[in-house]
Amino acid sequence: MEELPQSSDFRSIVLNNTPLIDVRAPVEFAKGAFPHAVNLPLMNDEERHVVGIKYKEEGNAEAVKLGHALVSGDVKEARIKAWTDFIASHPDAMLYCFRGGQRSQIAQEWLAENGREIVRLKGGYKAFRNWLMQETEKAVEQFKPIVLGGRTGSGKTILLKKLQNAIDLEGLANHRGSSFGRDITPQPTLIDFENALAYDLIQKLDQGFEHLVFEDEGKCVGRIYLPKILVEHLSEAPLVVLETPTEKRIEITFDEYVAKAHEKYKEVYHADYLKVWTEDMHEAMKRIQKRLGGQRYKIVCEIFEDALKEQKKNSSLEGYKVWIAYLLSEYYDPMYDYQIERNASRILFRGNAQEIEAFLKEYR
C-alpha cells in the first residue's frame, strides 16, 4: 500500500479547530486529550491491556497478531463504522494515537481500504502535546498582560466575556476560583486544561492582539495549577480594578451561586437537588471555617440555615442574599482589600464595567 498522508502542521490544526479522532484506549484519553478530539479507540482498555502483556512477554510481532485477532470480524467493522460516521460529518478530521505509530497507521489503512482517506498526526499525541507546551512558553513572551481585579461579585467574568482579547481561565478550568466555585460538572484534567489554554493563547495571538486580559487569579483555579511561566508573567502585570456597588455585587453573586446553581442542580439531581446543593454549600463553608474563625463560621451557618428554612417554607430564595452579604463583608472583602493594598503600585485604572471596557479598547 502506498504511503498514507501524515501532517505535523499543528498550528493549522489549532487555528482551524480541526476535529480529531483519538484512537487510543479510553483510559489514555481520560488522562488528557486535545480540544475537538473524540475518542473512537482501535482497542478498548481490556484489549489494550492484554496486548500490552503479550508485547512484554513475546515482543511486537506477537502483540500485533493478538491485536488483529481481538479486533476482527464484527468488532473491527464496528470500529471502522464509528470512524467513517465521524468522518462523514467532519470531513476535515485527522486521527492520532500516542506516538503516531502502529495504532493510528492501522486505523488509517483500514479506512483507506473502505474508501476513506484521512491524515494522521505525525508523532501522534506526544508530538502535538509537546508542541503545544512549547508554544505556551513562547506565547507568554509575545503578549502584554492586563489583570482584571475587583471584589467578589463585581462582575469580572461577565465583563471578561465581552472582551475579544480575554483569556477566561475560570471557564477553561470549569471553576469560579473561590471556595464556593466548584461547578456541578467536574474540572478537566490538568492536561486537558493546559491543551485548551495553549489553543486559546495561539488563536488570540494569531488574531493580532498585543494585550491579553486575564482575571486576577492565584497559582491555581480550583485544583488546576496554572503554568508557572504564566503565573510569573501575570504577577507583575498592570491591574485594572472593577468597582461595583455592594447591592449589585450581592445580586450578581446571588444570580450565579444560588439562582442559576439551583437550576443546574435540578437538571442533574431532580427531586434531590436541594439536598445535594445544601451539602455542597456546607462543604464550601467548612473549607473557609479556619479563616472565618469560630464565631463568624457559626453565624454564617445560622444565616444559611435560616435561608434554607425560608426556601422550604415559602419557596423564596431571598434569604440567601443575607447570607451572601455576610460572606462578602466578613470574609471576601477584607481578604481582597488586603491583597489589593499590597499591589496598589500595579493599579492602572479603576472604574465600572462600562468605563473599563472603554478604557481597554483605547489602551495601547
UniProtKB/Swiss-Prot annotation:
GO-annotated molecular function: tRNA 2-selenouridine synthase activity
Enzyme Commission number: 2.9.1.3
Disulphide bonds in the chain: none
Keyword Transferase listed: yes
Catalytic activity: 5-methylaminomethyl-2-thiouridine(34) in tRNA + selenophosphate + (2E)-geranyl diphosphate + H2O + H(+) = 5-methylaminomethyl-2-selenouridine(34) in tRNA + (2E)-thiogeraniol + phosphate + diphosphate; 5-methylaminomethyl-2-thiouridine(34) in tRNA + (2E)-geranyl diphosphate = 5-methylaminomethyl-S-(2E)-geranyl-thiouridine(34) in tRNA + diphosphate; 5-methylaminomethyl-S-(2E)-geranyl-thiouridine(34) in tRNA + selenophosphate + H(+) = 5-methylaminomethyl-2-(Se-phospho)selenouridine(34) in tRNA + (2E)-thiogeraniol; 5-methylaminomethyl-2-(Se-phospho)selenouridine(34) in tRNA + H2O = 5-methylaminomethyl-2-selenouridine(34) in tRNA + phosphate
Highest taxon above the source species: Bacteria
Keywords carried by this UniProt record: Selenium, Transferase
Coiled coil: none
Residues forming the catalytic site: C97 (s-selanylcysteine intermediate)
Name of a matching Pfam family: Rhodanese
Domain Rhodanese: 14-136
GO biological process, one term: tRNA wobble uridine modification
Family membership noted in the UniProt record: Belongs to the SelU family.
Biological role stated in the UniProt entry: Involved in the post-transcriptional modification of the uridine at the wobble position (U34) of tRNA(Lys), tRNA(Glu) and tRNA(Gln). Catalyzes the conversion of 2-thiouridine (S2U-RNA) to 2-selenouridine (Se2U-RNA). Acts in a two-step process involving geranylation of 2-thiouridine (S2U) to S-geranyl-2-thiouridine (geS2U) and subsequent selenation of the latter derivative to 2-selenouridine (Se2U) in the tRNA chain.
Subunit architecture: Monomer.
Protein name: tRNA 2-selenouridine synthase
Gene: selU
